């Protein structure tokens, strides 16, 4: 009697293990936060997100409520996973040579500069909005990957790898921006502690120490020191990930084990919690014409216009100058469609918005801009790739610029 249900159960298991499943759960949790924030249970939702949770030994700058622990604590694991992914690609994947690194890196830099300039141009004359310039600079791989997988053969394996590498570089550049521009005032004794712990982690790597508790302990100490240093504490995930061994077969196995252990935690707990805690905002008083205000308009245009122009323009220019080559089986039309998808900014964009406009009335309009820009980028990118004529810029099977 239960046999007919076996295939369905198998499909569910595959879905839950896929990136699409994680993206769906993140979207579901985010929608739940938004719905609760605009329901009769809004007060309970706010009470939950601001529930006091403070440990005196962490000092004045330590997280003091549930939402802060998610953003400043658990999100450290997200940045750790980002670094682990790029390390795996560098060791044995699509970034294993300088030539392979160059193409997505150039696109990521272009996709960072142009959206930031677009935002600053739109918000010119609004000094209170200036700090949000970094909100539209990142691409969210959690949402772009399921879309390109759903498109099947319309996106070549080489183009898929390029987009994923670009999204990873985007996240890394976003981390650098957060560390440099969104920290607090510097406290030199804590910075010295950060340097010493980082040196110890590097020493452990150089000494080929494979004991994970050493890196885990170092990461926790680093996070604690970063709280008082003035740099953002999530930088601990970046530094710890960079210091994990990966130079030989045993190190690569260690890296794979850590990644396989932490990634599901980030996919199914950390990111959904982040979306649930940060997307919830009251829609009371919001009107469509509010999207024409400087902050949401700047973010929306930065994502849906600045991002594809920056990514596609920088990549195409580097190909024309013969600095890099297109991935095998990739056309310029396909490249443009993928550049449109790069405007899907969610996790990092929300993260930066919370830092840029913390305690400001601009946080809700900023989130509106993120949602609108990301949704429009997803729709335009999907439609372009789905309905683009197959004879538009025939792909080159060897890479390079199609002739």
Curated annotation (Swiss-Prot):
The keyword Transmembrane helix belongs to this UniProt entry's keyword annotation: yes
Catalysed reactions, semicolon-separated: Na(+)(in) + 2 H(+)(out) = Na(+)(out) + 2 H(+)(in)
GO cellular component terms attached to this protein's record: plasma membrane
Subcellular location: Cell inner membrane
Membrane topology: Multi-pass membrane protein
Bilayer-spanning residue ranges: 23-43, 66-86, 101-121, 132-152, 161-181, 184-204, 219-239, 257-277, 297-317, 333-353, 363-383
GO molecular function, one term: sodium:proton antiporter activity
Disulphide bridges: none
GO term, biological process aspect, one: regulation of pH
A UniProt-annotated Pfam family: Na_H_antiport_1
InterPro entries: Na/H_antiporter_dom_sf (IPR023171), NhaA (IPR004670)
The keyword Iron-sulfur appears for this protein: no
Keyword annotations from UniProtKB, A to Z: Antiport, Cell inner membrane, Cell membrane, Ion transport, Membrane, Sodium, Sodium transport, Transmembrane, Transmembrane helix, Transport
Family in the record: Belongs to the NhaA Na(+)/H(+) (TC 2.A.33) antiporter family.
UniProt function note: Na(+)/H(+) antiporter that extrudes sodium in exchange for external protons.
Entry protein name: Na(+)/H(+) antiporter NhaA
Species this chain originates from: Gluconobacter oxydans (strain 621H)
């Amino acid at each position: 009697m239960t046999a007919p249900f076996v295939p369905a159960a198998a499909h569910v298991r595959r879905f839950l293990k896929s990136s699409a499943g994680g993206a769906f759960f993140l979207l579901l949790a985010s929608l739940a936060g938004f719905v609760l924030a605009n329901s009769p249970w809004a007060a309970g939702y706010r009470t939950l997100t601001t529930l006091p949770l403070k440990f005196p030994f962490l000092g004045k700058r330590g997280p003091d409520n549930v939402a802060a622990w998610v953003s400043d604590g658990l999100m450290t694991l997200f940045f750790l996973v980002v670094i682990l992914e790029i390390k795996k690609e560098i060791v044995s994947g699509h970034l294993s040579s300088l030539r392979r690194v160059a193409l997505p890196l150039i696109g990521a830099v272009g996709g960072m500069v142009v959206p930031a300039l677009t935002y600053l141009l739109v918000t010119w004359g609004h000094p209170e909005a200036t700090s949000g310039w970094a909100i539209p600079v990142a691409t969210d791989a959690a949402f772009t990957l399921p879309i390109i997988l759903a498109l099947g053969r319309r996106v070549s394996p080489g183009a898929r790898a390029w987009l994923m590498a670009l999204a990873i570089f985007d996240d890394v550049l976003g981390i650098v921006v957060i560390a440099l521009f969104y920290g607090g005032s510097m406290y030199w004794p804590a910075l010295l502690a950060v340097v010493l712990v980082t040196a110890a982690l590097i020493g452990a790597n150089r000494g080929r120490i494979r004991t994970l508790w050493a890196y885990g302990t170092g990461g926790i100490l680093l996070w604690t020191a970063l709280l008082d240093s003035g740099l953002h504490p999530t930088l601990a995930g970046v530094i710890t990930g960079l210091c994990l061994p990966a130079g030989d077969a045993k190190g690569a196995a260690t890296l794979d084990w850590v990644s396989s252990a932490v990634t599901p935690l980030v996919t199914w707990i950390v990111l959904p919690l982040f979306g649930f805690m940060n997307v919830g905002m009251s829609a009371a008083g919001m009107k469509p014409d509010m999207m024409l205000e400087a902050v949401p308009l700047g973010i929306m245009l930065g994502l849906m216009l600045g991002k594809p122009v920056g990514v596609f323009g920088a990549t195409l220019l580097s190909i024309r100058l013969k600095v890099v080559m297109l991935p095998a089986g990739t056309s310029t039309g396909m490249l443009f469609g993928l550049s449109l998808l790069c405007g899907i900014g969610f996790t990092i964009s929300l993260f930066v918005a919370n830092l840029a406009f913390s305690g400001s009335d601009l946080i809700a309009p900023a989130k509106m801009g993120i949602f609108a820009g990301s949704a429009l980028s997803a729709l335009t990118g999907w439609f372009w790739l789905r309905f683009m004529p197959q004879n538009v810029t025939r792909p080159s099977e060897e890479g390079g610029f199609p002739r």
